[in-house]
Amino acid sequence: MPESQNQVTNSQTLVIDAEKFEFEALEQQNGFATVVKFKVENPDVRPGDVLLILSGGDINFHGFIGKIEDGWGIAMDRNGSQLAAVVH
């Protein structure tokens, strides 16, 4: 009989307006940020959650948060990022 595991399988989506999103582009492709580092201000945000950056009704970035360390998160959107890779 398998042991029961105490793992939460639900993830949440962190939605941020593109105008207010401050980040560092760790990787980029064709001028768009594909891996970003950003300050995590909500203590409920966990690795595995989704980061969604919106500009009006347009999705600029949609990716999983892979790591959170010392209050900073790293998220990846390697396929569809429209987030300009400029210093914010």
Put a short name on every predicted segment.
Residues 1-21:
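N-terminal helix initiation/capping motif
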Residues 83-88:
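A short macromolecule-binding patch
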